[in-house]
């Protein structure tokens, strides 16, 4: 059997004849070698020799040299058809050279393909810049001539550009190193051997430049946007004149502001009140806040004052409407200049005016007949016009302005209707915050709320009939109780006494009706509580209740005398005792020594006054066993324990134990 006929790698095999056309473009070395001259597979020795002690392998077998010409290269048969050239390995970014890096400008816009020196220099105000560490690195690299910097050069650029990052504090340098190694937008470049110095370079990876180029197109917020400068407007070029020229022709922007882009971008950060345009040499008739009866003249580019206001608001200039009356248009007599606060206010304040509801005369819904005559400047009219209250703001700001305008026309006054400064009810003015008109407001001493009617304060809560409106501004409106605070005292006892009086009157208890007649001194007042009405006593009650007037009995404190004593006290005081003493008349008398320290709710003070000089504490409930009379029965002790010594937290004891301890 021929070896070549069974070899699948030879074209002569019938299985590979169809695939011969695929390899027609092989090099000449593959095509011109005759198949018969190529040797078969090399023969491998049947027994392979092992590894010697030295660790080197012995030669297994040697290939047979080809018998063809020596000029033709020898290619083994088993690699002839499967041979392919692998792609060259791509070195890592750290091994790239400077010559292999190609910077491609992004195709976003032509302005991004500028040179490094054309980028604006960030403004340094001494504070921490509003940029991340990655953005600072990108700003430094993208502004370098070669678009590459060493680590020390990045440190120098950041510290020289921003004074906040000084070299004395090395904390930010650690953050720079971490961002360089972890951020995918930066790559490390090895320094060429022929370039003096030490340290590798850092550059921006191709394709990541856009995020750092966006910085030069970044715009600040709306509040910090400065308005373009406005030239002076003369009386010859006014809105509404018959010249037919556009109103924007008089507002020429200075061309030197936009010569250099970095200078224009720096203006965003240096916006202040000094950059706001000021309008001078303008007649007061041209800047009246309300529309007049004169019809508007069609002007190319401007259809109505609303369009003018909209375009001016886009430019950051306060809305200005020039309106003249028929009489003034005929006479053309100049008037004193008007200094409007809106012209000196910043764009942020003009936006705040719109949010607070200050609208133009057209949006307020005023008719042509409501147009007033020229009056004093706006800055002098705030004292004459009252600030609308909360009630007016609820009815509607438009109705308030309309009513004020009609009132001024009926009276025949020549004062101009001006829109007063509006202040939100929930936001009181502060000494440091200006109102929308630009004038400093002082903090009001009282609450700007309407006086509540007396129907909201019933007589139960109001103890004075001569309540005036000033009383509602002294204290919080949340307090439902109003007492006479003319004699305010800092003594806590006095305050507690007044508080008890107010609570008794508010609850309308029976004790409160006779509180003033029964208590003639502070000592008697402190003994009065809503829960202990039977202990009320005064000079008359103490005189009537004596030992001699008590009924005859075995002792003073037997069952009959005790009930008579309590009934007499309640009848003298004119009050009704909450509960009767449910003591039985069948038990024997107690000794005086036992009842003295006894803590009974209804008669503790009576016996302490008559029999002893000391007052029993309401929390002391000690009873000594030796003072208990032998005639005391189980029934009487159990009744006393359940009635006069309630203890919901204690467990009930057996009856035999209660006989000995009463607990």
From Swiss-Prot:
Sorted UniProt keywords: Cell cycle, Cell division, DNA-binding, Mitosis, Nucleus, Phosphoprotein, Septation, Transcription, Transcription regulation
GO molecular function, one term: DNA-binding transcription activator activity, RNA polymerase II-specific
Bias (Low complexity): 340-355
Residue ranges: DNA binding: 128-222
Keyword DNA-binding carried by entry: yes
Main subcellular location of this protein, as a coarse class: nucleus
Gene Ontology CC entries for this record: chromatin; M/G1 phase-specific MADS box-forkhead transcription factor complex; nucleus
InterPro entries in the record: Fork_head_dom, FOX_domain-containing, TF_fork_head_CS_2, WH-like_DNA-bd_sf, WH_DNA-bd_sf
SMART domains (alphabetical): FH
Disordered: region residues: 220-241, 325-387
Phosphoserine: residues carrying this PTM: 446
An example Gene Ontology biological process: positive regulation of transcription by RNA polymerase II
Localization terms from the record: Nucleus
Free-text function comment from the UniProt entry: Required for promoter sequence element PCB-driven, M-phase-specific transcription. Acts as a transcriptional activator with a role in the regulation of mitosis. Regulates septation and the periodic transcription of cdc15.
Name of this chain's protein: Forkhead protein sep1
């Amino acid at each position: 059997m021929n070896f070549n006929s069974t070899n699948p790698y030879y074209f002569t095999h019938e299985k590979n004849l169809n695939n011969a056309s695929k390899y027609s473009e092989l090099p000449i070395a593959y095509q011109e070698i005759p198949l018969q001259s190529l040797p078969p597979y090399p023969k491998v020795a049947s027994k392979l020799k092992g590894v010697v002690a030295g660790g080197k392998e012995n030669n297994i077998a040697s290939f047979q040299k080809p018998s063809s010409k020596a000029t033709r290269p020898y290619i083994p048969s088993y690699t002839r058809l499967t041979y392919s050239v692998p792609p060259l390995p791509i070195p890592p970014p750290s091994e790239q050279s400077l010559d292999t890096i190609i910077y491609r400008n992004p195709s976003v816009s032509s302005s991004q393909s500028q040179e490094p020196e054309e980028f604006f220099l960030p403004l340094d105000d001494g504070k921490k810049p509003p940029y991340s560490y990655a953005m600072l690195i990108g700003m430094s690299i993208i502004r370098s001539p070669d678009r590459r910097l060493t680590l020390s050069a990045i440190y120098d650029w950041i510290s020289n550009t921003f004074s906040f990052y000084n070299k004395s504090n090395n904390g930010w340098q650690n953050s720079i190193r971490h961002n360089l190694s972890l951020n995918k937008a930066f790559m490390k470049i090895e320094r060429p051997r022929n370039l003096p110095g030490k340290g590798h370079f850092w550059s921006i990876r191709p394709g990541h430049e856009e995020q750092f180029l966006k910085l030069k197109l970044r715009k600040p917020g709306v509040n910090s946007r400065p308005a373009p400068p406005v030239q002076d407007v003369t009386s010859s070029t006014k809105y509404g004149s018959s010249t037919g020229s556009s109103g924007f022709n008089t507002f020429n922007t200075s061309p030197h502001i936009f010569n250099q882009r970095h200078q224009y971008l720096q203006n965003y950060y240096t916006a202040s009140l000094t950059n706001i345009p000021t309008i001078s040499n303008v007649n007061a008739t041209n800047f009246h806040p309300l529309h007049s009866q004169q019809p508007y003249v069609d002007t190319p580019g401007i259809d109505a004052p609303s369009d003018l206001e909209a375009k001016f608001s886009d430019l950051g200039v306060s809305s200005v409407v020039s309106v003249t009356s028929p009489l003034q248009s005929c006479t053309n007599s100049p008037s004193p200049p008007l200094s409007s606060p809106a012209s000196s206010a910043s764009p942020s304040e003009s936006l705040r005016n719109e949010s607070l509801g200050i609208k133009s005369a057209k949006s307020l819904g005023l008719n042509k007949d409501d147009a007033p005559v020229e009056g004093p400047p706006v800055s002098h009219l705030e004292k004459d016009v009252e600030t609308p209250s909360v009630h007016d703001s609820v009815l509607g700001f438009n109705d308030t302005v309309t009513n004020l305008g009609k009132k001024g026309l009926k009276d025949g006054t020549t004062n101009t209707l001006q829109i007063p400064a509006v202040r939100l009810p929930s936001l009181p003015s502060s000494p440091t915050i200006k109102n929308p008109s630009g004038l400093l407001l002082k903090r009001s001493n009282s609450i700007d709320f309407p006086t509540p009617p007396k129907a909201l304060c019933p007589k139960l809560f109001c103890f004075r009939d001569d309540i005036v409106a000033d009383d509602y501004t002294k204290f919080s409106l949340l307090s439902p109780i109003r007492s006479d605070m003319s004699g305010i005292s800092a003594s806590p006892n006095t305050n507690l006494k007044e508080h008890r009086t107010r609570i008794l009157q508010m609850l309308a208890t029976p004790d409160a009706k006779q509180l003033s007649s029964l208590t003639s001194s502070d000592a008697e007042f402190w003994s009065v509580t809503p829960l202990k009405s039977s202990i009320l006593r005064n000079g008359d009650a103490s005189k009537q209740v004596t030992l001699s007037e008590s009924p005859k009995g075995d002792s003073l404190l037997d069952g009959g005398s005790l009930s008579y004593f309590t009934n007499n006290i309640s009848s003298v005081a004119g009050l009704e005792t909450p509960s009767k003493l449910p003591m039985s008349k069948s038990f024997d008398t107690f000794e005086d020594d036992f009842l003295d320290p006894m803590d009974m709710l209804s008669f503790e003070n009576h016996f302490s006054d008559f029999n002893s000089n000391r007052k029993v504490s309401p929390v002391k409930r000690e009873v000594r066993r030796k003072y208990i009379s032998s005639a005391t029965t189980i029934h009487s002790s159990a009744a006393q324990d359940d009635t006069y010594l309630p203890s919901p937290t204690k467990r009930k004891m057996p009856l035999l134990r209660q006989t000995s301890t009463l607990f």
